[in-house]
From Swiss-Prot:
It is found in: Cytoplasm. Keywords: Cytoplasm. The keyword Cytoplasm applies. It comes from Oceanobacillus iheyensis (strain DSM 14371 / CIP 107618 / JCM 11309 / KCTC 3954 / HTE831). Belongs to the UPF0298 family. GO terms for cellular component: cytoplasm. Signal peptide: none annotated. InterPro entries: DUF2129. Pfam families: DUF2129. This is UPF0298 protein OB1449.
Length: 91
């Protein structure tokens, strides 16, 4: 069974506090220079985890990822005619 997950972008002041974020979800990426981390969390626990994370003193800002809500099926996608011709020739 697949669980719907969503990313949280956490902006912080010090890199050493990343260990505390690991208990709330999967830390996918952490940037040392820009001081942010991307954490994946179950969508049904999203509100609770976001409130817990924003209450940490080292966190400056929390943003939700909009990736699950972006449409990825395109209606007006036109195929390349040259590629179709090559596939029909059997090259």
């Amino acid at each position: 069974m697949r669980v719907n997950r969503q990313g949280i972008i956490v902006w912080f002041q010090h890199m050493k506090n990343i260990k505390q974020l690991r208990k709330h979800g999967n830390v996918i990426y952490a940037s040392k220079t820009k001081r942010y981390a991307v954490i994946y969390v179950n969508q049904d626990e999203m509100d609770d985890v976001e409130l817990k994370i924003i209450n940490y003193p080292f966190v400056s800002k929390v943003e939700r990822s909009q990736k699950p809500f972006v449409r990825t099926d395109y209606e007006n996608a036109k195929p390349d005619k040259a590629k179709q011709y090559d596939y029909k020739m059997g090259i």
